[in-house]
Every structure is written in C-alpha cells, then in structure tokens.
C-alpha cells in the first residue's frame, strides 16, 4: 500500500532518503512523521501430528500447493502463543511449542516469518481458511517439493537439520 497523506496531520507525504533508505515523510512543517514501513511479524507452525508432519493448503491457493500453518500476531501476543492459537483456529488442534526453528525475511510481502515446531493433538477439523490437509512422514518431507514456496523449503530444511 502506498500512502499519499500523513496519518497524523493529513499533510502530503514525500519521499526522503533516511539512513540510505527511501522513506515516506510528512512534508508539513513541524509534523515530523516518518513511515518506517517495518516488516509485519508472522508465525509459521511446522506441525507434528500423529507421528507425521501435517501440511495445509490455504483455501485461496492452487490445488497442489501445501505449506505450514501461518498467521499474524495479535496485539500484545507472544509469537509462541500466536503459533499455538493459529494451530487451534485453523486445525482445531491443541499444540505445544517444541522449539523455535528460525526467522525468515519475506521481502515480497514485507513480513518476517517466525517459525516454530509444534507437537499437536486432538481431533483434526479445518476452518474456512484451510481447503485441505495431508499427513506425510519425515522421509517424505525430506524430498517434498514446496516450490514455489521457497521460505517453506528453508524452514523445513532448517527443521530437518536441527
């Protein structure tokens, strides 16, 4: 989204180089607003369920593309709580974070992905965001083609080499 006016004073925004990065700044005298455009944190869950890895296909994605469960953090929510909440909301499963896998910049969407491994249990029931799920073994995961989801591939690779 490209803003045109200052959210503080409604003055026009202009581009200015700050610390060698082009930023939108308010051109109204005395305002001083800078749109820093910080990346949005997103959590991703590599879900271990019934001795296998659970992959999910978002309802808006093509048929063959499966990935991890992902979602945004709520205000004042820790990433660990957010990832367990997303697993509950999207899959109806209780989960426990087993470990932090890593952080991954998703430059195209201005997001930072915080990936966690979770152990899940309960009765699987998807919500409206998930079109379908599949369970695969760790051996299958090692050779699974996540293209074009390069970040999912990186997260899985890092989890496998833990």
Where are these regions (language model features)?
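Acidic, metal-coordinating catalytic segment for phosphate/diphosphate chemistry
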Residues: 2-44
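Conserved hydrophobic/aromatic beta-strand scaffold that supports enzyme active sites
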Residues: 5, 25, 46, 55, ...
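A short coil-to-beta-strand element that immediately follows conserved catalytic motifs
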Residues: 16-17, 93-102
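Short acidic/glycine-enriched loop/turn segments that link adjacent beta-strands
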Residues: 20, 62, 107-111
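Conserved Nudix-box catalytic region and its N-terminal flanking loop in Nudix hydrolases
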Residues: 48-89
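Active-site-adjacent beta-strand/loop module that shapes the phosphate/pyrophosphate-binding cleft
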Residues: 104-126, 134, 138
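NUDIX/MutT-family hydrolases
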Residues: 126-157
